[in-house]
Amino acid sequence: YKRQVRGGTEKIKVSAGANYFDQQGMVVTGSGYQKFSLRLNLDFEIAKWISFGINSSYAMTKQDREDGNFNDFITSSPLAEIYDADGKYTKYINSEGNYNPLYRAEHYGREVTRDNYRLNFFMDVKPFKGFNYRLNTSVYNQTSEDGSYKDSQYPGGGGTAVLDESRTQNWLVENIVTYKVPIRNKKHQLTLTGVQSVDHNGSKSIGYSVENLPVDKDWNFISQGEFTGKPRRQFNENNLVSFMARAQYSLLDRYLLNVAVRRDGSSRFGKENKWGTFPSAAFAWRVNQESFLRDVSWIDNLKLRVSYGIVGNQNGIGNYTTLGLADNKEYEFGNVFQMGYLPSKELSNPNLKWEQSATANFGVDFSFFNGRLNGTVEYYNTHTKDLLVKRSLNASLGYTTMLDNLGKTKSSGIDLSLNGDVVRTKEFTWTLGTNFSMYKNEIVRIDDTLDENGKPASQVAQGWIIGE
């Protein structure tokens, strides 16, 4: 089911919708999937110089799952005896002791529910000509509950229940300032941009398992059972703070220059290395606008471009790697199991820093014969240093691995794309396109150790891929 409403005035625009979806399971009665969602979008112009908008959505899902694998149902023999003389499910479907999947499903229950809420808000402020401030914010929340139980008749042992609950909360705040510098000579155009953002990602979960439920109840009565082991608890959080400044200059709309620098700070790194600075620059030349090509009618576009930039990577490191992790271990003391903690097998490294990749790019964009033939030729060369990889350690130290900034790699390649309209009429267009790529990856150095031949020493067996 789907309903949608739209309306508004010159200054206010509203769109709202609701959806409901219900799908029954294919095999077992009672299994299925349900989803209910709402959506609301609003654009409001308060005045000519200020406006804002909201995009929001909410979704609630419920999934009832059957026990076992789907193959257990479709691979059972069609001659299997699934009912007894009283019309109830048999426990076994043959004399070999194979359980009846329908019997198991009858004594098993699992329900997974999720609530998702997403809100995006923006505001544009233009107090004077050429100046624009934009605020972007977004919030995402998800809560989920995964509960299952096996009653006392479940084959192989029942009277158990499991409950896992989790919550995810992400939010982003972004401030963007753009200023088109007024220049009397219209041949010149200069635009300045500044960006500041804060990105937060967090999640937490907890889970319980019990046995010996006194009565055949579901996971909502989990407190009546005997806990098996300790509750499972997880917590993850990371923050990224960024600043960026950019200048875009154009001369005659023919010579284009873009210079930028950004500074990122990540909570994943140690105190001394949280921040990284990453500059970039790009230049483009519209050759077809030069006087010596302006009268060449078959050239629609011919642009040469070159760029160089450095980007940082933090994805190779966990949220708490630099702090040092501990593993929980149970031990028996006084005939009672206690929970203790031991250092992780991975040695912490507070000196980890951003992995950096520097890329030089040269390209040509072209379009000929009124757009009937167009394509791109591009060459790139990337050097990556301070790779975030695990270093093997001597087990006698009490640790087996340590994440470290090791080595350098180099990659280069050529990308070609060509598209053409073989046939172009008012009623019919036939377009052909082709792409070609050639690249090479090379390990320049894995660490600072060289062998007797002056080549990078060892650790290739750790999982590195060597390019041709």
Describe the role of every protein-language-model region.
Residues 2-66, 117-120:
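Transmembrane beta-barrel wall of Gram-negative outer-membrane proteins
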Residues 3, 70-102:
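Acidic, glycine-rich flexible loop segments
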Residues 31-32, 68-70, 295-300:
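Short, glycine-/polar-rich solvent-exposed loops and beta-turns at beta-strand/coil boundaries
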Residues 41-50, 55-60, 94-150, 160-468:
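Extracellular/periplasmic, surface-exposed regions of secreted and cell-surface proteins
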Residues 61-77, 446-450:
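Low-complexity intrinsically disordered tracts that form flexible linkers/tails across taxa
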Residues 65-67, 87, 112:
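Immediate N-terminus of the mature polypeptide
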Residues 155-158:
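Flexible, solvent-exposed loop segments that connect beta-strands
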